[in-house]
Amino acid sequence: MLLYEALELCGYDVFFLDYSDKDHKMNPHPFIDNKKIIPWAEYRDSYNKKVDIVFCPGISANKELKDCTKLKNPKSKIVAVHYGNNLLSDIHEMLFKEEKRFYLMSPECNVDHIVYSPHYKLAKQYYECIERAPSSEIPYIWDPKFIELDAETRGYSLGYKHSEKPNIAVAEPNLNISKTCFLPIITILKLLEENPDKINNAAIFANIFHDEKVDMSKVKYWLANQTVIKKHPQRVFFDPRRAFSYILKEDNPIIFSHQFYNSLNYIYLEAMYFGHPLVHNSPEFKTYGYYYEKFNIIDAKSCILNAVENFQKDELLHKKAAKQLIRKYSIEENIKSINEMIERINNA
């Protein structure tokens, strides 16, 4: 959606290509209502305008799409858009998952260009090898309207409320090693051992603890019976994943995050937009919140204590940093970069 709006703001004629059929419908959304949408059958059979670039975010460009587009314009470019850390996730999928789902090195994967989010530059050579095409960065952009709409729909009024003993929330997806709750859990255990009076509760929002297909019984037993949680059974909760607006509203927490080669994250911007303390290890967001290096548990614990003791005092500084970062990743601030990306694609 944001890529569509960014391209539109740059002056390009943009449309969504809709593959919906009787079995697969395009998800309705208020922000799509006023967008140009062309059904696949119409695009294939009767759409006669020249298409210069087809962006494929999160999906593969199948042969039919490529052939159809090239027939309309032999110079058109099919562009794979990678917003995920495919290098790490594919290693995990290929080696450790029973169901093997990863990019295959076959001619069907071929595209004309690849764009990747800036924090996935480490995978540049990987993308170029599997897609057999040149690659470049796509600007990272964010807009608050999505979480604002979600909060409005739920009837929430969001905004951090200072507390002497705040809650902590961890909201990592745990889909692969790049964003997990592992280090935050260990840090929270350390905090409860050494400074139990500094926080109220900690909530780990992680579906893996509720997935019937994954046997977490030994982990649950260890946490409940062989760690400091045994002394604080009503202070650490393992809940299913929830909408981030729900977490902000119901827990009013310090957001505690850990990432591994996944340093740009919408929840960081959402947390700072609503004024929440953020404990994180993302170099790109170093100016906001409380930053710890890599896997440093001791520093992460110190950051939590720093947030508890000093966030209210330093609130104006955090607001200034938040404003600068939110501006940095806005569509308006990235118009030039978007145009430069289009130029790179066309000239490749």
Predicted feature locations:
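Well-ordered, non-membrane alpha-helical segments in soluble/globular domains
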Residues: 1-3, 61-67, 94-102, 180-190, ...
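Extended catalytic core of nucleotide-activated donor transferases of GT-like folds
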Residues: 1-110, 237-244
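Structural motif
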Residues: 18-20, 55-61, 81-84, 117-119, ...
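Donor nucleotide-activated moiety binding/catalytic core segment of transferases
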Residues: 40-44, 211-274
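Catalytic core of nucleotide-activated saccharide and alditol-phosphate transferases
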Residues: 69-165
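Conserved catalytic-core segment of nucleotide-activated headgroup transferases in glycan assembly
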Residues: 121-235
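Catalytic binding pocket for nucleotide-activated donors in carbohydrate/polymer assembly enzymes
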Residues: 250-329
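C-terminal alpha-helical cap of glycosyltransferases
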Residues: 327-348
